Every structure is written in structure tokens, then in C-alpha cells.
Regions:
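Polymerase palm active-site segment centered on the conserved acidic dipeptide of motif C
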Residues: 2-4, 26, 39-66, 384-397, ...
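Conserved catalytic core of nucleic-acid polymerases
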Residues: 25, 146, 229-275, 344-468, ...
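Conserved "right-hand" nucleotidyltransferase catalytic core of DNA-directed polymerases
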Residues: 1-174, 183-185, 192-195, 205, ...
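Catalytic palm subdomain of template-directed nucleic-acid polymerases
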Residues: 22-44, 273, 366, 371, ...
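Append "Rare intracellular matches occur via the same short Y/T/C beta-strand/loop motifs
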Residues: 299, 303, 326-343
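Short, contiguous acidic/charged loop-to-helix segments that flank catalytic cores in large enzymes
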Residues: 108, 133-139, 171, 188, ...
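Solvent-exposed, low-complexity, repeat-rich "mucin-like" stalks and linkers
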Residues: 267, 271-309
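Function-dense linear segments that define catalytic or interfacial modules
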Residues: 147-254, 346
Length: 533
């Protein structure tokens, strides 16, 4: 593993830019034959899907927003009142009165099992893929090489143009690029969750360190923390006759307490189960107490399962130390035990989108608009109440309002904010720059690390740096070395080379993959997925 000392190891953006420019002048080699075959395949698939739309959905032109909206609104109208209306919830904006068929909305519907949405995603992807593959063919020279121009953004991230390689879906690009020399093999070394990892480590958000290292994955783990199974206890101070927990029947007879205080609540998310049975409702607790008296709360609460079965589950209550001495009524959160929780693809994707938006300064209202499936307000509160992230956002906001226009990365590289439309946009940019800029710094260090490593380990004649994209490096390994070295050993070498730890940060995770260099085409319907990066 590459140990990086942020006070000693200094990024070299100039060297990174020169190195990548040299790689692009040499060129990225395209398998032209496969590229053309794939282009023709996707053009044919696009036409097949277009015919399907007419047959299955009565939509003669899937490029027509009006026809798509008419179909969706018709389907939404068929949903009975009182039944959850996914299409209306996801695709219709109450504030503007407008419908959307954008990628994000279609992915959410697809994740919930709507075949129309997946077919539309496939059609659009097939169209985009065919156009992209045609572009690669047009930009390639007589040797099948493309030579993109490179520029650096304000964060020092590398951008490619003519062709715009960053806009090409990764799985598609990796399917058609091939080694510079025949017989060699390309390996991808991908740094996983780099941007959220930088934010968590940079701010010192120790509550999220576990999520970075969890085998369940960063976003699944954070989701489970955010939406962990809970109930609530409402403590009514100097209101009820006795200092104890009251049953629902007693509260109903009293008639002085709102039913909202003692009515059972829904679980925080859809997929909470006990012994494989879904939880439909969770009992809440209502207790009377005097000011300055600690309430005595039960060790278990009842939950109602999908088949109306009722069972008791253990509950651990949060401390009342900061609340019980006050005059006002208060609530305590109880964390349930013995509950299994599964995160669906739709929930994970929406949580990830909301988390990344929050990282770059989105408001609570903005997060609530993003979240159509999960509780956006809960996500906002969960993230912004993490003390380290809360301090970071506050510090950046203050720094921006003081008139500063430059901000540093974790390595001290200074970045210029540039022009902003307003103060809020400037704050969002300042929240983003240290994260993206640190990512660029890391890439520059890894490029130097690669060159040093292959020299020190006698691998200079065995492998070379072929291409970089986002937080990923593509390594070309010589045919002769591949013949005598097992694939898992090559993967271990590349992991040791690229995996890194900055100071006392949680070590970065990398994923090593051997890229497909053959001419086979094996594509299934439902292939269109969210951006892989």
C-alpha cells in the first residue's frame, strides 16, 4: 500500500498534465471492427425497441415527450385513491405542474419494477451508444487510435474532448478499447467511493469511518444507519394523572391526548422484516411524568407484521439527560433490536444521489425534491447532524462570506473559485473544490507512484500507464509477463501499487479488473444501468 504523507508528498499537477497529454498523443486504441459491430447492434436494438413501444404501450415515438407523458399520466390515473402512486410521486412535480421522463425518474421506476421505464432507458441507451460508437469510429485515425485533447478544470480534474471520453459510459468504453500493442492485456484499477471518502476523511467524520470499511458497501451502510428501525416515546410533562406508561385504551378514555401521540407508526423504510415477514406497523409509547423525574420506559414494544401477527421486540431508548429537567413535553427515540433490514437498489441509488448533493451544499428543500422514494428530510437531518460535516459546511460558508475566492485541498493546493452567480452558488463551489481538487492531487501522486514502483520492482519492461479516467487508472501489461504471471498475482501487484492511505485516513479501497479484449458481443435486454462511476 502507498502511504502518503500530506505534509511531505506534494502533488505535481504539471507532471500529471504532461504525462496524460503524452498518452493521448500516442493515442487510445479502438477495436474498430468491434466498435462498428456494436454500433450496428445498438442501431438494430433501437429500432426493435421502438417497435415494441408502439405494440406494448401505444407510443409510436419514444423520442416524443408528449407521448411519453400521456402514457405515464394515463397509467397514474388508473391507480386507486389511497394506493401509493409511484408514477405520480416520481414523475410529477406538484409545484410546477410538470411531468418528467428524465433518466433519474425512469431509473427509480425501473428499480421498482416498471418495465416501461426500463424499456425507455434501454431505448435511450441504445441510441446514445450507437451515436457514441459512431463518434469513436469517426475520430479514430488509420491505425484505430483516437487522440483526445486534454484540459484541466478549475479543480485540476482532467477533461477530454474530440472525442469526449468522459461522457462515454464506462462499460461501453472498456468494451471497445484495446491494448496499444497486440497481445497485451489491459487492467482497470478503480478507486472506490473516492469523493465521499475524501469528504469523510477530510472532515474527520468518525461516525462514518465504519461505513467506509463495511463489507455491505458505503451507501448501504449509511442508509441502514439513517433509516435504522426505531420507535418513539412521547413524555407528557405534568399532563397525565400518574407518572407511568399509559396504554392506548387508557389514553382513548381520557380523551385529552391527541391520537397522533399514541398511534402506531410505519417503519422508516420498506424492507424491514422479522423472521422473513415484513413489518407493517410499530407500537409507540406515551408516558406521563413530572418535571425533573426520569420516565421508566418498557424494554420491549410490539410490532405488527404483514400477516397481522404481533410480536415483541427489544428496544433501547436514547438518554433523556438533556430533556427531563425541562417543563416542556419531549420525545425519545427507541432503537429496535431483532429487525432485519434490506436496502433496495432504488433506495440505495436515491440515498447516494441525495448524499452527494448534500456534500456540495444542497438545501433541505433540494434534498426533499430529489427524494421520491425515501424520506429526504430524514436524509438531510442525518447527514447535517454529523458534527464534523456540520462544522465543515459552517466553516466553508463563513469562509466564503468573508470574501475569500481561493481554497486549498488536503495537500494545500490552492484553487480559485472563479465567477459565481450568487453567494449560495459560491458556497456550493467552495464545498466542492477541496473534494475534487484533492482527487486530482491524488491522481497526480499515483501517476508518480506508478513510475517509481515499476522501476523499483523491475517491472518497467512489463507494464505501462495506458489511460486515466476519473478515479481510475488503466494499465497495459505486456503479453510475455501475462504468460508467466498468474492473473491474481498481477491483481495483487496493481493493488499494492495503487491502493493508498493518506496520513491516518481510512485506507482507500481499489478494485482491479481485467478488461475484455475479445470480439464477442453478449448484451441482454435491461442493459441500461445508472452511471457506473
Amino acid at each position: 500500500m502507498y502511504k502518503i504523507n500530506s505534509k511531505v508528498d506534494k502533488p505535481d499537477i504539471g507532471n500529471m498534465s504532461i504525462t496524460i497529454d503524452k498518452m493521448m498523443r500516442r493515442g487510445v486504441r479502438i477495436n474498430i471492427s468491434k466498435c462498428q459491430n456494436l454500433r450496428d447492434y445498438y442501431l438494430n436494438l433501437m429500432n426493435v425497441l421502438k417497435e415494441d413501444f408502439d405494440t406494448k404501450y401505444g407510443v409510436s415515438n419514444p423520442n416524443s415527450t408528449n407521448q411519453l407523458v400521456y402514457y405515464l399520466s394515463s397509467k397514474a390515473d388508473e391507480v386507486s385513491l389511497g394506493v401509493k402512486n409511484d408514477i405520480l410521486n416520481i414523475c410529477y412535480d406538484d409545484e410546477t405542474g410538470k411531468w418528467t421522463t428524465n433518466k433519474e425518474a425512469m431509473h427509480k421506476l425501473s428499480d421498482l419494477g416498471y418495465t416501461f421505464a426500463q424499456d425507455l432507458l434501454d431505448y435511450r441507451a441504445a441510441k446514445k451508444y450507437a451515436e457514441t460508437l459512431n463518434m469513436l469510429c469517426e475520430f479514430s485515425d488509420e491505425n484505430g487510435l483516437v487522440h483526445p485533447r486534454i484540459t484541466l478544470g478549475k479543480t485540476n480534474r482532467v477533461n477530454y474532448s474530440d472525442p469526449a471520453l468522459m461522457t462515454i459510459p464506462k462499460t461501453l468504453l472498456w468494451d471497445v478499447i484495446t491494448s496499444y500493442e497486440d497481445g497485451n492485456t489491459l487492467y482497470s484499477v478503480d478507486i472506490k467511493n473516492q469523493e465521499p471518502s475524501i469528504l469523510i476523511n477530510l472532515t474527520g467524520a468518525k461516525e462514518l469511518y465504519y461505513a467506509l470499511e463495511s463489507p455491505d458497501g458505503l451507501y448501504e451502510t449509511m442508509f441502514k444507519q439513517c433509516f435504522s428501525p426505531t420507535t418513539k416515546a412521547t413524555i407528557l410533562v405534568d399532563t397525565l394523572p400518574e407518572n407511568r406508561v399509559y396504554s392506548i385504551e387508557e389514553l382513548r378514555k381520557l380523551g385529552t391526548v391527541s391520537p397522533a401521540t399514541y398511534s402506531a407508526i410505519r417503519p422508516n423504510c420498506e424492507n424491514m422484516t422479522i423472521n422473513g415477514k415484513k413489518i407493517d406497523a410499530i407500537e409507540v409509547v406515551c408516558a406521563g411524568s413530572e418535571k425533573g423525574l426520569r420516565p421508566v420506559l418498557p424494554d420491549t414494544v410490539k410490532v405488527i407484521l404483514e400477516d397481522s401477527e404481533v410480536c415483541d421486540v427489544p428496544v433501547t431508548w436514547e438518554s433523556c439527560d438533556k430533556k427531563y429537567k425541562k417543563n416542556a413535553d419531549y420525545e425519545l427515540v427507541g432503537h429496535l433490536g431483532g429487525v432485519d433490514m434490506t436496502v433496495s437498489k432504488a433506495e440505495r441509488n436515491e440515498f447516494k444521489t441525495a448524499y452527494l448533493a448534500l456534500s456540495y451544499g444542497a438545501s433541505k428543500m433540494g434534498i426533499k425534491k430529489i427524494c421520491k422514494i425515501i424520506d429526504g428530510a430524514r436524509v438531510y437531518d442525518y447527514i447535517t447532524k454529523i458534527e464534523a460535516i456540520k462544522k465543515y459546511r459552517s466553516m466553508i460558508t463563513k469562509y466564503s462570506k468573508e470574501g475569500n475566492t481561493c481554497i486549498g485541498t488536503a495537500f494545500g493546493t490552492m484553487l480559485d473559485v472563479g465567477e459565481s452567480y450568487n453567494d449560495r452558488a459560491k458556497v456550493r463551489t467552495m464545498l466542492d473544490l477541496p473534494i475534487q481538487g484533492t482527487g486530482a492531487d491524488i491522481l497526480s501522486l499515483l501517476i508518480k507512484r506508478f513510475e517509481t514502483y515499476i522501476q523499483e520492482h523491475g517491472l518497467a519492461d512489463c507494464m505501462s500507464l495506458y489511460f486515466t479516467r476519473h478515479d481510475e487508472l488503466i494499465i497495459e501489461v505486456k503479453k510475455e509477463y501475462c504468460v508467466k504471471t498468474p492473473e491474481d498475482e498481477i491483481s495483487n501487484i496493481l493493488t499494492d501499487m495503487i491502493a493508498y492511505q493518506i496520513d491516518d485516513w481510512v485506507p482507500a479501497k481499489v478494485e482491479v479488473k481485467k478488461l475484455n479484449n475479445n470480439d464477442s458481443i453478449d448484451i441482454q435486454r435491461g442493459f441500461a444501468s445508472e452511471d457506473e462511476d
